[in-house]
């Protein structure tokens, strides 16, 4: 029977084959006509790539069917070397969750029941009410806006 093979250039070649022929045999015949080695050939029929060991009958290829010939691409992305680091990775700061942390910000006087703030609140408008400043040994610091008040140092 006669089948057609459409090459990359759009040229159509005709091959005389039997339905019992394997795909390997068809590729060998294409090599004889076109000079393309069989290991670089990929034959496609009805959207499926044809495997070398199978026959034309396995793929239901009949007389005057058209196979499409495309070339196999070799390779891919360049292999990358694994990075080696000279120093160990820096440990990230872990946020310490303190239960009932609000109790550290205010003090209730037992006798009068009056509430007093233990920490200074940030006066900046962008921070808003309830944003307390961190109490360092020599300054008050707002972590939200960066406002800093340094204590007067007596010499």
UniProtKB/Swiss-Prot annotation:
Query: What's the superkingdom here?
Result: Eukaryota
Which keywords annotate this record?
Answer: Cytoplasm, Isopeptide bond, Metal-binding, Nucleus, Ribonucleoprotein, Ribosomal protein, Ubl conjugation, Zinc, Zinc-finger
Renumbered to this chain, where is the cross-link Glycyl lysine isopeptide (Lys-Gly) (interchain with G-Cter in ubiquitin)? 48, 63
Molecular function terms from GO: mRNA binding; protein tag activity; structural constituent of ribosome; ubiquitin protein ligase binding; zinc ion binding
ZnF region ranges: C4-type? 122-145
Ribonucleoprotein as a keyword?
Answer: yes
Asked whether the keyword Nucleus is assigned, the reply is yes
- Cross-link of type Glycyl lysine isopeptide (Gly-Lys) (interchain with K-? in acceptor proteins): positions? 76
What are the GO BP annotations of this UniProt entry? modification-dependent protein catabolic process; protein ubiquitination; translation
Listed GO cellular component terms?
cytoplasm; nucleus; plastid; ribonucleoprotein complex; ribosome
Q: Which InterPro entries match?
A: Ribosomal_eS31 (IPR002906), Ribosomal_eS31_euk-type_sf (IPR038582), Ribosomal_zn-bd (IPR011332), Ubiquitin-like_dom (IPR000626), Ubiquitin-like_domsf (IPR029071), Ubiquitin_CS (IPR019954), Ubiquitin_dom (IPR019956), Ubiquitin_ubiquitin-like (IPR050158)
Please name the CDD domains in this protein's record: Ubl_ubiquitin
Task: Share any extra remarks.
Answer: Ubiquitin is generally synthesized as a polyubiquitin precursor with tandem head to tail repeats. Often, there are one to three additional amino acids after the last repeat, removed in the mature protein. Alternatively, ubiquitin extension protein is synthesized as a single copy of ubiquitin fused to a ribosomal protein (either eL40 or eS31) or to an ubiquitin-related protein (either RUB1 or RUB2). Following translation, extension protein is cleaved from ubiquitin.
Hey, which family's this protein in?
In the N-terminal section; belongs to the ubiquitin family. In the C-terminal section; belongs to the eukaryotic ribosomal protein eS31 family.
Protein's name according to its UniProt entry: Ubiquitin-ribosomal protein eS31z fusion protein
Give the species. Answer: Oryza sativa subsp. japonica
């Amino acid at each position: 029977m006669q089948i057609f093979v459409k090459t990359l250039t759009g040229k159509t070649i005709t091959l005389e084959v039997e339905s019992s022929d394997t795909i390997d045999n068809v590729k060998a015949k294409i090599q004889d006509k076109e000079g393309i080695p069989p290991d670089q050939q990929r034959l496609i029929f009805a959207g499926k790539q044809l495997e070398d060991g199978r026959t034309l009958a396995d793929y239901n290829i009949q007389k005057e069917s058209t196979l499409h010939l495309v070339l196999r691409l070799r390779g891919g992305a360049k292999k990358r070397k694994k990075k080696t680091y000279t120093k160990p990775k820096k440990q990230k700061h872990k946020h310490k969750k303190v239960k009932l942390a609000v109790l550290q910000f205010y003090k209730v006087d037992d006798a009068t029941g009056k509430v007093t703030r233990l920490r200074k609140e940030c006066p900046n408008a962008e921070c808003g009410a309830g944003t307390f400043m961190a109490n360092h040994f020599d300054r008050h610091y707002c972590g939200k806006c960066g406002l800093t008040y340094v204590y007067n140092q007596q010499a």
